[in-house]
Amino acid sequence: MSEKKINLLDLDRKAMRALFADMGEKPFRADQLMKWLYHFGVSDFEEMTNINKVLRQKLAARCEIVAPEISSFQKSTDGTIKFAINVGQGQEVETVYIPEDDRATLCVSSQVGCALECTFCSTGQQGFNRNLTVSEIVGQIWRVSHFLGFAKDTGERPITNVVMMGMGEPLLNLANVIPAMDIMLDDFGFSLSKRRVTLSTSGVVPALDKLGDAIDVALAVSIHAPNDELRDILVPINKKYPLDEFLAGIRRYIAKSNANRGRVTVEYVMLDHINDSTDQAHELAKLMKDTPCKVNLIPFNPYPGSPYGRSSNSRIDRFSKVLMEYGFTVIVRKTRGDDIDAACGQLAGDIRDRTKRLAKKRMQENQISVTMN
């Protein structure tokens, strides 16, 4: 039986250099290869013309370059594109490209499904299957970059920002998310600014501390309720890591981070007559007063079977004005791609194994999988 080949898209620069050292090669050769992968999108060793033939042959014998394939895509009337990405075993995740006048953001998934079961989120209602590998995470960017033309002009704006806000809770997959983000930030990788890579979390506090020790990226935090009683219902992980613990973890992260410029983004989905009253706005403002942040109000995007409705514009406006009276910067997120179910909270994918009992068992046994090993 032949030895399984190493997928080079699984390796950040440190791991890539270690592989090349094992082959008796100098570190700069690893850097050259990464540029071919991430600057030019080359997947054929024979096209890497500044790498000598002997090394190309060694690489072909020992390594491979395999990214998950785009199985289908839908384009919204607003230019948003939702991609179904085939990650094997009959499973798909969803990746969303969001173009704007001055940027283009790619919303990337970190897991097949999600174990957190947030009650307003379509993905959370589908159950959890597995973590994505490094190559499956960076492969989403790699494939969409190919779709957009990499160095060629296809009329689509190239990716300038990446947000880890797709399917899954990124902090439950640190072992793969951290090296994937390293590749996003690396000058020999996708070469993105740390302020242009954002990780969103619902509050796995021990993993948030580990993230802050390992890498510096922009942070978005899913709060969605002004008190523990309501958040226990909307975001069940709150029962394990309540708001006071989460906010303390956020402040620790801010203290370590340059990418956040001293404050994080608070995400707050607007659910009609659930969490959107002016009293709750006052409560949220008092909750967040010691945590430097701007607030992103997200109109709820309904999905089939959802028990919630979207807050009216007038309720969102009143809620926003209360927060601004306390001095918060408030942004009401423009809904993008809702006509193709690509908006926030609508990603579900094709998850064949939706056994929630398995997810809950893993959460109990692994303390929600916060180790990086």
From Swiss-Prot:
It catalyses: adenosine(2503) in 23S rRNA + 2 reduced [2Fe-2S]-[ferredoxin] + 2 S-adenosyl-L-methionine = 2-methyladenosine(2503) in 23S rRNA + 5'-deoxyadenosine + L-methionine + 2 oxidized [2Fe-2S]-[ferredoxin] + S-adenosyl-L-homocysteine; adenosine(37) in tRNA + 2 reduced [2Fe-2S]-[ferredoxin] + 2 S-adenosyl-L-methionine = 2-methyladenosine(37) in tRNA + 5'-deoxyadenosine + L-methionine + 2 oxidized [2Fe-2S]-[ferredoxin] + S-adenosyl-L-homocysteine. It is found in: Cytoplasm. Binds 1 [4Fe-4S] cluster. The cluster is coordinated with 3 cysteines and an exchangeable S-adenosyl-L-methionine. Its main location: cytoplasm. Its EC number is 2.1.1.192. GO terms for cellular component: cytoplasm. Belongs to the radical SAM superfamily. RlmN family. Reaction proceeds by a ping-pong mechanism involving intermediate methylation of a conserved cysteine residue. Specifically methylates position 2 of adenine 2503 in 23S rRNA and position 2 of adenine 37 in tRNAs. m2A2503 modification seems to play a crucial role in the proofreading step occurring at the peptidyl transferase center and thus would serve to optimize ribosomal fidelity. This is Dual-specificity RNA methyltransferase RlmN. The gene is rlmN.
